[in-house]
């Protein structure tokens, strides 16, 4: 009698790749809703556009590689890549921004290396960095949070309607012919600066941290809107941990290193750096810690390595935010840490039993 012997590993996860990707998208919903509430419907428009483009590119590349496209589409990895890139760009960014970004993410950063499971770098972050370096104006032109405008700190002379929003994204002009620059000029106050950007600009102009934080955009812990967006992604990340979709090592390493670095410099250089709470709840901190850095393909594979990997990202995020040329450093930090993964895994691989 012959028996079928399966190859190792013999222990399998109950969750398949499509299941994991669905959980990631589901747990990112709170953050998406928070962004939509604070920054308008443009976030949802960018997401729908991104998913459509990403799935189309995924299918075309698979056909070009003479492989069945439906198998790749069913793993939902392209959907997650589109999701992460869509929430990282300004809601009013023109349609070609997300298109160029997804071309880099799907075609170059993913399939050029062999497809799912073969890419050494996070595809969404590759796309984001390419866009940020190539089109800095479009990628840093965030609108003011809607509650800040409604509170009267910034007065919109001609509010942007949903029709104007769609027209701006796809044609570059509103229905009545106004450009995005003219729309922003119609709002008095800080319209294109995130709290991180405003804080760094203030420091460069010679203001102290306390003077900068007195501006209306910094109301709350880490800036109007952004603190709640980060808390929403934190809630989604905790669900991912509870469902064992991700492990705790990378988020703890990331947030722990960022907390230690910001606490140290806030204690000894209080007028030159933001508070730890500001760093934890501003920018893409929670999105990066739970949804980006935890990419199982491009992250470290050992337990000690994952903690070190997260700590490297957290440290680099603080360094780039404090002394770099860009307001936030999550994307650059993740890619630099991706480069270190082979070295991290080599020196943190577990000792073989008996040796």
Swiss-Prot record:
Q: A GO term (biological process) for this protein?
A: transmembrane transport
The top EC class, named as a word, is: translocase
**E.C. no:** 7.-.-.-
Keywords carried by this UniProt record: Cell inner membrane, Cell membrane, Electron transport, Flavoprotein, FMN, Membrane, Phosphoprotein, Translocase, Transmembrane, Transmembrane helix, Transport
Instruction: Kindly give the membrane topology term recorded for this protein.
Output: Multi-pass membrane protein
Residues bearing the modification FMN phosphoryl threonine: 194
> Tell me, how does this one assemble?
The complex is composed of six subunits: RnfA, RnfB, RnfC, RnfD, RnfE and RnfG.
Q: Which family does it belong to?
A: Belongs to the NqrB/RnfD family.
Q: What is this protein called?
A: Ion-translocating oxidoreductase complex subunit D
Organism whose genome encodes this protein = Vibrio vulnificus (strain YJ016)
């Amino acid at each position: 009698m012959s028996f079928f012997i399966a190859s190792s590993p013999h222990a399998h996860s109950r969750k398949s790749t499509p299941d994991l990707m669905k959980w990631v998208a589901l747990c990112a919903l709170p953050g998406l809703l928070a962004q939509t509430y604070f920054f308008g419907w443009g976030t949802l428009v960018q997401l729908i556009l991104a998913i459509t483009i990403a799935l189309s590119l995924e299918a075309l590349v698979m056909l070009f590689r003479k492989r069945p496209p439906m198998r790749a589409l069913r793993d939902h990895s392209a959907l997650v890549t589109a999701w992460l890139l869509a929430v990282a760009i300004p809601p009013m960014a023109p349609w070609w921004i997300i298109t160029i970004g997804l071309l880099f993410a799907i075609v170059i950063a993913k399939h050029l290396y062999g497809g799912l499971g073969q890419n050494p770098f996070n595809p969404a972050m590759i796309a984001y960095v390419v866009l940020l370096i190539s089109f800095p104006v479009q990628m840093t032109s965030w609108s003011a949070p809607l509650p800040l405008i409604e509170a009267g700190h910034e007065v919109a002379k001609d509010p942007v309607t949903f029709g104007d929003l769609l027209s701006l994204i796809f044609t570059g002009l509103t229905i009545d012919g106004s450009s995005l620059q003219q729309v922003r000029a119609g709002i008095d106050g800080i319209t294109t600066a995130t709290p991180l950007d405003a804080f760094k600009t203030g420091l460069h102009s010679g203001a102290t941290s306390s003077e900068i934080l007195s501006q209306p955009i910094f109301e709350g812990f880490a800036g109007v809107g952004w603190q709640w967006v980060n808390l929403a992604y934190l809630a989604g990340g905790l669900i991912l941990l509870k469902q064992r979709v991700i492990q705790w090592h990378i988020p703890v390493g990331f947030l722990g290193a960022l907390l230690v670095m910001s606490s140290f410099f806030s204690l000894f250089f209080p007028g030159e750096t933001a508070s730890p709470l500001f760093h934890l709840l501003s920018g893409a901190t929670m999105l990066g810690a739970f949804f980006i850095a935890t990419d199982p393909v491009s992250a470290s594979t050992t337990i000690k390595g994952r903690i070190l990997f997260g700590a490297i990202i957290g440290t680099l995020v603080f360094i780039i935010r404090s002394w770099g040329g860009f307001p936030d450093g999550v994307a650059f930090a993740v890619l630099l840490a991706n480069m270190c993964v082979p070295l991290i895994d080599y020196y943190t691989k577990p000792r073989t039993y008996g040796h």
